[in-house]
């Protein structure tokens, strides 16, 4: 492993060359936007959908500036406030944070190797993920998965100095050769976590509304599949996917507050403890038994 990427923290690793790839999420979204608009799709950015309601045989979408009437609605609200109350039982908005270094010099790159430029992740419960950018910076993120009281989501929470400090320490523990390298960009964002760690689907209002949600940070790779299944459900079309147990079943719901907040904090503490000791405590074993989990 250290012949590929030189870190004193590595004792082994697995390099998957056939089923993994690195994708720039921003460029992917911009490309999808261009493709959609070329097909006649109209996109109204920064227009907040505040609620939906039944409208005859269709659906009415309310916004601060007006209303949209539609025969059917596909909901992809992610970590933001769900427009169907039932979704809120299954999804918890969790903040994930990233940092990016200044461009590395050739000498610094030589110190760490990484000539094959793989995307990397460790296998801890509270894991880190990292990759090299086109201009030889290191994007470094993960570990902290922060749930705020009552699922709070706003732009103020996208900056968290205590997380930056923690991630910075972990970075230099992993690459002590890079001590002194500066971080030039830091940000955070909310993801839609559910107890089974991957997307789930549902319908409402006699099939007029369908949703795909709960990607738990895996949406860049799987949202195309999630969207296709959601559209099949919305059209009432049976497919191989819609007939599977995976699509038809939902994750176990999270408990209401304050038990949701307390439970998530207890789970984070327990996961961190397992990463340090290698032992899974009674709390985590209980969650395993009931098929519950928490992650980013």
What are the roles of these predicted feature ranges?
Residues 49-51, 57, 67-107, 111-207, ...:
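Active-site substrate-recognition segment that forms the wall
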Residues 2, 42-44, 182-186:
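General small-molecule cofactor/ligand-binding pocket signal
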Residues 27, 31, 166, 221-229:
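Short amphipathic alpha-helical face segments that pack within enzyme cores
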Residues 2-9:
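Flexible hinge/switch segments at interdomain interfaces of large molecular machines
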Residues 9-72:
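Helical element adjacent to the flavin cofactor pocket in flavoenzyme catalytic cores
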């Amino acid at each position: 492993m250290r012949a590929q990427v030189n870190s004193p923290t590595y004792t082994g690793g697995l390099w998957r060359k056939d089923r993994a790839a690195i994708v720039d999420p921003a460029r992917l979204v911009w490309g999808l936007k261009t493709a959609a608009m070329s097909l006649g799709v109209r996109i109204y950015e920064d227009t907040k959908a505040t609620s939906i309601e039944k409208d005859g045989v269709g659906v009415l979408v309310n916004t601060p500036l007006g209303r949209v009437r539609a025969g059917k609605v596909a909901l992809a609200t992610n970590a933001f406030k769900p427009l169907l109350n039932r979704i809120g039982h299954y999804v918890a908005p969790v903040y994930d944070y990233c940092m990016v270094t200044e461009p590395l010099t050739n000498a610094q790159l030589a110190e760490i190797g990484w000539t094959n430029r793989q995307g990397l992740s460790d296998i801890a419960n509270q894991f880190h993920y990292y990759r090299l950018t086109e201009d030889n910076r290191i994007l470094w993120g993960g570990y902290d998965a922060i749930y705020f009281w009552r699922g709070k989501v706003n732009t103020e929470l996208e900056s968290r100095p205590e997380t930056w400090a923690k991630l910075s320490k972990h970075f230099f523990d992993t690459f002590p050769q890079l001590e002194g390298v500066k971080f030039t960009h830091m940000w955070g964002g909310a993801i839609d976590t559910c107890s089974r760690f991957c997307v789930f689907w549902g319908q409402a209002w006699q099939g007029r509304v369908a949703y795909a949600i709960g990607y738990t940070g895996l949406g860049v790779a799987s949202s195309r599949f999630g969207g296709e299944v959601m559209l099949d459900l919305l059209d009432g079309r049976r497919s191989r996917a819609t007939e599977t147990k995976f699509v038809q079943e939902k994750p176990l719901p999270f408990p209401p507050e304050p038990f949701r907040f307390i439970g998530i904090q207890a789970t984070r503490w327990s996961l961190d403890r397992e990463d340090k000791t290698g032992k899974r405590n009674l709390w985590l074993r209980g969650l395993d038994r009931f098929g519950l989990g928490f992650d980013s």
